[in-house]
Amino acid sequence: MLKDQNLDIERKQDHIEINLTKNVESTLKSGFESIHFIHNALPEINYDSVNTTTTFLGKSLQAPILISSMTGGTTRARDINYRLAQVAQKAGIAMGLGSMRVLLTEPDTIKTFAVRHIAPDIPLLANIGAVQLNYGVTPKECQYLVDAIKADALILHLNVLQELTQPEGNRNWEKLLPKIREVVNYLSIPVIVKEVGYGLSKKVAESLIDAGVKVLDIAGSGGTSWSQVEAYRATNSLQNRIASSFINWGIPTLDSLKMVREVSKDIPIITSGGLKSGIDGAKAIRIGANIFGLAGQFLKAADTSESLLSEEIQLIIEQLKITMLCTGSRTLKDLAKAEIRL
C-alpha cells in the first residue's frame, strides 16, 4: 500500500514537471481554426455593456470559463491550486481540482486540494478517475471527496488511453457504466463526466446522459496529449514507442462538441481541449458549449506567480468580450447566434 501511495505522489510530480517543460501537444488541431466569425463593423453596442455573465451549477460566473482540472497531492501542486483558487475567486470563474484519489489513502494531502476557504463563492469541482470504481473506490468514498473540499460537483474523468500507455495504468474498463450510475444515484450533488483530451463520441454521450450524468466535459483532441506525457514517463523504449504512437489520437474538440450537442440540446457542455484564447472560447459558445475550459497555459502561469495567472485569465476574458462586441453580441445568448463562416 505504501508503495502505491508513493507512486501516486511521484506520478503527480512527474505530470507537473513534464507538462511545464516538455512539448506534449497533440498533433491534431482542435478544429476551431476552421471557424471564422463574420466581423460586424457597426455593432451599435457600448463595450461596457457587453455581458459575459452566466450560471453554472446554480452559481453565478462573471465569465463562462473553467480552470480545468490539473493537479493536487504535492507541495508544488498545493501552491499551484492556491493561486488558481485565489485568481478564480477574484475573476468569478469556475475551478476543477486534479485527481483526488491520493486523498483516499493519504489524508494529509487534503491541504493540497482544500481551497474553499480561498474561493468561497465559485463553482468548485472534486475529481477522481472513473476507472477507480473498478478498483475498489465506492460511491461513499466519492461523497467523502466531495465533502472534503465542499465541492459543488464531482468529476469522474475518463482517461482510458492515458491509463493504457502508463506503466502502472489501470486496464479493467469492463462494466464501468453501471458503477457510474451508482455514483450518480448516491451523491448529493451533480456528477460531471470528463474526457482528458480525446473527446466524447455521440454514443458515449448518450450512455452517460442515460446514466443520469448532469454535465459533460468533452475535452477533445487538440491540446495536451496525455499519451505523450506518459511517453516521457516511460521506463523503457517499448513503453515509449507505444505511448508515442498515439500522439494524433482522438476526436478533435469541435467534432466532439457537435456530436454531443446533437445528442441533447439541454445537457450543459463544458468544452475543453486545445482552446488557446477567448476567441476559441467564443467559437465554442457559438457552436453549443455552455462554458469553456483551459488548463495548460493556466498551469504555466500559476507555477510562476499569482499576478501572471491573473493577467492570463484577464487576457482570455478581454479576448472574449472583444469578440462579442465585434460580432454584435451583447450577451452570451447573442454570441450563440452570431454569424460565422466555416
From Swiss-Prot:
Binding site for substrate: 11-12, 99-101, 162
Disulfide bonds: none
Required co-factors: FMN; NADPH; Mg(2+)
This protein's GO CC annotations: cytoplasm
Main localization category: cytoplasm
Pfam family, one: FMN_dh
GO biological process: isoprenoid biosynthetic process
Isomerase recorded as keyword: yes
Binding site for Mg(2+): 163
EC number, as in UniProt: 5.3.3.2
Amino acids binding FMN: 68-71, 99, 127, 194, 224, 274-276, 295-296
Record's subcellular location: Cytoplasm
Protein keywords: Cytoplasm, Flavoprotein, FMN, Isomerase, Isoprene biosynthesis, Magnesium, Metal-binding, NADP
HAMAP family the UniProt entry points to: Idi_2 (MF_00354)
PANTHER family in alphabetical order: ISOPENTENYL-DIPHOSPHATE DELTA-ISOMERASE
Summary of subunit composition and partner proteins: Homooctamer. Dimer of tetramers.
Annotated function: Involved in the biosynthesis of isoprenoids. Catalyzes the 1,3-allylic rearrangement of the homoallylic substrate isopentenyl (IPP) to its allylic isomer, dimethylallyl diphosphate (DMAPP).
Family: Belongs to the IPP isomerase type 2 family.
The protein's name in its UniProt record: Isopentenyl-diphosphate delta-isomerase
